């Protein structure tokens, strides 16, 4: 034995003190003990049917997306997965139900970007940042800027120039104030300093019809609402929101590519659970959603609604929630948007 080895062991007794042995044994068992609750939660998950709550009416696009996801999840986990449509109170009834549900990961909320915006428009019974745990992002929703093809406008720059001269009307239309297309249009006219009052229309179909009829020059809408007009040559696509081109129209540049620096907004669709849901259960659910996005039926249903399938984990969705809440609530305060509650 070398001298240094001898010196290292000189003060260590051959037989450890019993108390020291017990302390070492307890410390060794601590990681296992801490892991047991999480493992126990996962062993029986899901222990009863899943409930996917949706802030939309039965038969709507969002309801169809939820049902496609629920069907696939049911096949994966071997448990019933129900869709619960709660469109009341502009969809806030859905959030209220999930916020009050047990934090056992069996009740989930399917929502999109406007979920974190709504409390700035009208009183909400929950806080989207504090009362929910993001699970996973499952899709994004790009919007296209489309113009009446009869107009001599082929670029976004030309549209903005004519809007400044008030020779064309760029809408801020929607059937409900605070919809995604409405918010993006408000951001557009604010960034490029021209006047565009809000026009009440019936959904995106009504919005597009205004452009086709020549009552508006342009609008923001998802691709399925525009596809017929584009294929018939009545509408011209100038650009798309988001950080990358859309697979719906890959030759259409992003608005950022056209020179609108920073205009890369894209809505997300994500799943949420009540606050205080244990992290292992969030991760397990996120994994199942990721598997579900490999389903051709889920992909087809998402794309039929204008959504691009895109999975991101809980942390990435949480970051998007905080970013969008800060940005869009700030815009709402700046332009003083309010939902008419009839009071």
List PLM regions with ranges.
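Hinge/capping helix and adjacent helix->loop/strand transition within the periplasmic-binding protein
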Residues: 100-106, 120-206, 255, 268-301
């Amino acid at each position: 034995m070398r001298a240094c080895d001898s010196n290292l062991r000189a003060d260590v007794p051959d037989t450890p003190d019993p108390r020291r042995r017990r302390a070492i044994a307890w410390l060794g068992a601590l990681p296992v003990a801490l892991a047991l609750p999480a493992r126990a939660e996962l062993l029986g998950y899901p222990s009863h049917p899943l409930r996917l709550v949706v802030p939309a009416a039965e038969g709507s696009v969002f309801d169809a997306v939820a049902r496609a996801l629920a069907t696939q999840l049911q096949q994966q986990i071997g448990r019933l997965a129900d869709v619960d449509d709660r469109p009341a109170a502009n969809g806030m009834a859905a959030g209220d139900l999930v916020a009050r549900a047990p934090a056992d990961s069996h009740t989930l909320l399917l929502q999109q970007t406007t979920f974190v915006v709504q409390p700035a428009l009208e009183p909400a019974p929950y806080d989207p940042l504090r009362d929910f745990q993001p699970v996973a992002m499952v899709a994004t929703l790009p919007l296209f800027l489309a113009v009446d093809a009869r107009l001599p406008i082929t670029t976004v720059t030309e549209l903005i120039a004519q809007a400044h001269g008030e020779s064309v009307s760029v809408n801020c239309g929607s059937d409900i104030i605070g919809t995604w297309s409405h918010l993006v249009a408000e951001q557009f006219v604010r960034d490029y300093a021209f006047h565009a009052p809000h026009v009440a229309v019936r959904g995106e179909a009504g919005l597009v019809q205004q452009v086709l009829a020549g009552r508006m020059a342009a609008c923001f809408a998802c691709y399925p609402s525009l596809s017929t007009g584009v294929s018939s040559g009545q509408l011209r696509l100038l650009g798309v929101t988001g950080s990358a081109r859309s697979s719906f129209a890959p030759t259409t540049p992003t608005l950022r590519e056209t020179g609108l620096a920073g205009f890369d907004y894209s809505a997300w669709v994500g799943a949420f659970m009540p606050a205080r849901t244990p992290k292992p259960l969030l991760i397990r659910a996120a994994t199942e959603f990721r598997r579900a996005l490999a389903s051709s039926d889920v992909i087809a249903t998402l794309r039929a609604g204008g959504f691009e399938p895109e999975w991101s984990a809980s942390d990435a969705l949480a970051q998007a929630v905080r970013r969008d809440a800060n940005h869009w609530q700030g815009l709402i305060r700046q332009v003083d948007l309010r939902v008419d509650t009839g009071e």
